[in-house]
Amino acid sequence: ASQAYGLSFTPGTWVESIQITKGAGSAVNGYESISGQINTELIKPIGDIPFFLNAYGSTDSRFELNTHFNTKLSDKWSSSLFLHGNTRVAKSDMNNDGFLDNPLAKQINVLNRYQYYNEENGLVSFINFRYLNDEKQTGELDFDKNRDRGTTNNWGSEINTERLDLSTKVGYVFKDLPYQSLGFQNAFNIHNQHSYFGLNQYNIKQSSYYSNLIFNSIISNTMNKFATGLNFTYDKYQEFVNVNDYSRIDNSVGAFFEYTYDNDDDFSLILGGRIDNHNRLGTFVTPRLHARYNPWEKAVLRFSAGRRKRSANINAENQP
């Protein structure tokens, strides 16, 4: 339900790196991607600095504060606490069209991360807890939410979102086979949004669970790798547009296999596929192909092809 807000729910100071995939995504990551994927890697507790403070202010009344606390709990456990707050307090209409250039906003975002790392037995794990509260108001410059909501005096909108996330990731690298690993990911979140756009009201509560088990190894040598595994998704939507009820449940279970060839020089190939069973879409297969070739040092040719299947969430994805 948060697709329309993209990375605005992930503060920039939390991000260690961003990976962008163009074209059909990896079969490992699900059956939906066809035009690309964005993955954000958050700063890890191990290796982070003990304290970080960042403050930002601009002439258009956008203010932001970021604070990171990092501590080593033991030889194998580390923890980080990320605090983020931002607000926009003043109205602006630089182009004089009668509407706000940017929404009035207020956000509180808290993340607590724990990392376990045991080099002796090859075990690493992450536990994440996050709470988000986000409020936005937009519309005409003269809109007053206390006076004009539910009327035709001035057009306005409010979007109030509360979100809770819990995720875990456990990885194991086989001690005598460093190229062989096993990973298990779980994520649970509750997204609760109350909003209105003019005279139209839109409320949605989404409860989601995602689980992914993946095994990585090689075939003969490290130029030939493969990944295989299982995953399960569950989404419960309690969605209302005015008095219309669009509540539903989506769940799926799937299996995937992906082969990678990489000569560590000028050519790599990823060939994969998955089979999934969805409670509303049925059983289907989604193949994926990626190829990369360097004909010379400063040139890269890429090719990707694949099939995807997706259950659209048309109201949440097309919010103003």
Give a label for each model feature.
Residues 88-109, 115-182, 188-206:
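Flexible loop and strand-edge segments within Gram-negative outer membrane beta-barrel domains
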Residues 6-8, 24-27, 37, 41-71:
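Short strand-turn segments of transmembrane beta-barrel domains in outer membranes
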Residues 42, 55-59, 85-89, 116-118, ...:
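Transmembrane beta-strands of outer-membrane beta-barrel pores
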Residues 1, 76-95, 107, 133, 144-146, 182-190, 194, 279-284, ...:
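Surface-exposed extracellular loop regions of Gram-negative outer-membrane beta-barrel proteins
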Residues 1-22, 110:
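Short acidic/polar hinge/loop motifs at secondary-structure boundaries
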